Amino acid sequence: MTNSIEDVCEQAQVILLVGSNPEEAHPVMGMRIRQAVERGAKLIVVDPRDIGLASKADIHLKLRPGTNVAFANGMAHAIIAQGLADKEFVENRTEGFEEFAVMVADYTPEKVAEICGIDADDLVQAATMYAKADRAPIIYCLGVAEHSTGTEGVMSMSNMAMLVGKLGR
């Protein structure tokens, strides 16, 4: 998670929930996310399961299990392709952007749709919604972290947040 609970519940405009079922695993947080959605925050659920919060989601991307990294790289591709990266943040606070952009260039929405079993247009819509929001935390949990590609999954979520300058926002 890239933000405090207060940031998520009181400030978020978009919440990107990846591989996490907070209503079951963290009920207080789940309730607070539900309240944030009720106050107008947009919700993107990325989970193969029909978790409770999926019914409140603006977009539900039901990835094939094990495809979190491809999903995140596809989001990054769409963000870069649309010119939505936070150039100032990337230039001043990150390194290796050029190499990263080359790496995600192969993760077109169509390719990611095939890998993940999702709709390419939904991926682009999610990337756009996430990138354009001023305050959009990523909340991930065991569905990302406790996987054979967990380290890469967590790094991919961090890369996505840094790409749009949303660490702490």
Q: Where in this protein do the model-derived segments appear?
A:
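Cofactor-pocket helix-loop regions in the catalytic cores of large enzyme subunits
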Residues: 1-169
